[in-house]
């Protein structure tokens, strides 16, 4: 009886803390220089219009997004008007962190502006090409979005 009661108390105290803590996951990250262009028309990306689109949220070019150049494609954006359009991700590589706004689809991991990858890699985006990062979805306010 004592063992069951202690187990129940431990579970009641421990579980809420562990389930409330977001866990970071690992994925690939690469760059595409077309995201470096602040005049990139959002009408040409997966997250263009529709209820979840960036244009609907008031942004017409990549440069208008508050945390530009930290924008790019995300594997979580599967199709046009995805509910993951405009999501903010905390992306970390070797103790460097950026907050990335998902505006497009990526077949694998994240595909972001070279300038943004240079921030993560201390200017080594071109040399490294593709890296492993940890990421987690965070509040959109961390990307400067409403």
From Swiss-Prot:
Keywords: Glycoprotein, Secreted, Signal
PTM annotation, UniProt: Glycosylated.
Keyword RNA-binding: no
Compartments, record wording: Secreted
Gene3D superfamilies for this protein: RlpA-like domain
Entry coiled-coil feature ranges: none
Signal peptide: 1-20
Pfam family, one: Cerato-platanin
GO CC aspect terms: extracellular region
Family, as annotated: Belongs to the cerato-platanin family.
Name of the protein described by the UniProt record: Heat-stable 19 kDa antigen
Organism: Coccidioides immitis (strain RS)
Organism classification: Eukaryota, Fungi, Dikarya, Ascomycota, Pezizomycotina
